[in-house]
């Protein structure tokens, strides 16, 4: 993607994620004037781009009592599902624990959309290549 394209991608995901948070707060009756500042929406977009670019790349995660390696599409996909579940649960109350779930969801969705515009050629890493042996 390159440095400049990555910066623009990151900032666009962040701005669009913040707009998702503001609009969802207004739509669902929460106070839209509560300030929200953070990079989590932009990072959500980066996670989506990583999942699209390297779906089978192994990610190290802590599960129960040990570290294991799972494919990126599974780890990031489950993270996104948890954001949707927690975001839906936060709609029922006045507080979401200070977490802007709509920004996470919006940043992820916009990351999925924007990565197609910003990446011209997908680089296949050696560990992602299939072997006949």
What label would you give each PLM region?
Residues 1-133:
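A detector for small-residue-rich transmembrane helices and their helix-helix packing motifs
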């Amino acid at each position: 993607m390159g440095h400049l394209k990555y910066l623009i991608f990151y900032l666009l995901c962040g701005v669009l994620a913040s707009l998702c948070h503001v609009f969802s707060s207004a739509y669902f009756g929460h106070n839209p004037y509560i300030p929200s500042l953070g990079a989590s929406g932009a990072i959500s977009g980066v996670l989506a781009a990583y999942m699209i670019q390297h779906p089978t790349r192994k990610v190290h995660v802590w599960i129960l009592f040990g570290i294991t390696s799972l494919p990126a599409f599974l780890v990031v996909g489950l993270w996104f599902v948890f954001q949707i579940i927690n975001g839906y649960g936060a709609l029922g109350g006045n507080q979401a624990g200070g977490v802007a779930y709509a920004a996470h969801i919006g940043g992820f969705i916009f990351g999925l959309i924007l990565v197609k515009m910003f990446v011209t050629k997908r680089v296949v890493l050696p560990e992602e290549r299939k072997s006949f042996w």
